[in-house]
Amino acid sequence: GGAIGALFSATAIYLSSFSLLLVGSYFTGIYMSAHGFYRFAASDAASDDFRPKAISYVMAAGLASAIIGPQLGSVMFDALSIPFMGVYAATFALNCLGFVIFPFLTVGTAKNETKAPRVGRTRLEMLKTPRIATAIICACVSYSLMNLVMTSTPLAVVGCGFAKESAGHIVTAHVLAMFIPSFFTGHIITRFGVERVVGTGLFILMGSGIVALAGVDLPNFYIALILLGFGWNFGFIGATAMLATAHTVEERGTVQGMNDFMVFGLVTIASLTSGQLMNCSGGNPIEGWSAVNFAMIPFLTLAFASLIWLSLITKKAAKTEYLTEKFPE
């Protein structure tokens, strides 16, 4: 899908066809939605102990993308006779690498599984499972709030009188903060438990909002966006690891699909809402930036409440199991 989308887009640039560019973007969207499942593929192929680390390492690849992508785009922007055409040509070439790499990829667990009729719980029953519901809520909140704030950041930075270059540097620092922790997030999850890591991520997101609301100087923007990146990493990777342990093998495709549909659907809404919040005070950037960060409060409250709910239910179940074993009927 990515290669086809890039090919259509490059052709659209060459022919100056906006309609063809939309077709290319459609295929690119399909590709983008599919590659989000790489983290689940790594999780499904890993052992129980290595699963959080596998998810974390896949997400860490985003660091290379964050560094290589912009540089490649700058180099290829005018590499061909028509601006942007070289960018799509490079994208086509990168996607074609998958045809070389994936034939050599073997996932051992797939060989041991036999196809069987779909059995088990309905989607609604799955969503009523405390661990699945909590994982999806925390993933949605972590990703959506990160996107909500990040989308408005360049507008707020420039609107507060700082240079566009400063806005770019702040976003770069944020992206690095999103992916650098991935090299050790999995180890932290294994050591301290997924619920604590997700909770820590939510606290860091809250800290990001507090710093942002404390002032509109450059240090505030830098610190807030770096914290936003760290909070997203712990919250989203932790929630993904939590979800991976909350369903059966037969249910994983359905659960993973529901999760990503909700997460990225809400991310889209957050992106659109971000601009509206920035404009809610008639275009005043300081008041708009405050509105964006105040909007985090109810959603963080929901995520914290879901984690507390899960903790109480888990403790109650453990206590019941202990009493049953100690005092059998």
Where are these regions (language model features)?
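A membrane-interface helix-boundary motif in multi-pass transporters
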Residues: 75-93, 276-300
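Cytoplasmic helix-loop-helix junction between adjacent transmembrane helices
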Residues: 24-60
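C-terminal membrane-cytosol helix-exit motif in multi-pass small-molecule transporters
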Residues: 92-113, 306-311
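Helix-to-loop junctions at the C-terminal end of transmembrane segments
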Residues: 77, 181-194, 278
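Helix-loop-helix hairpin linking two adjacent transmembrane segments in secondary transporters
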Residues: 18-20, 48, 57-103
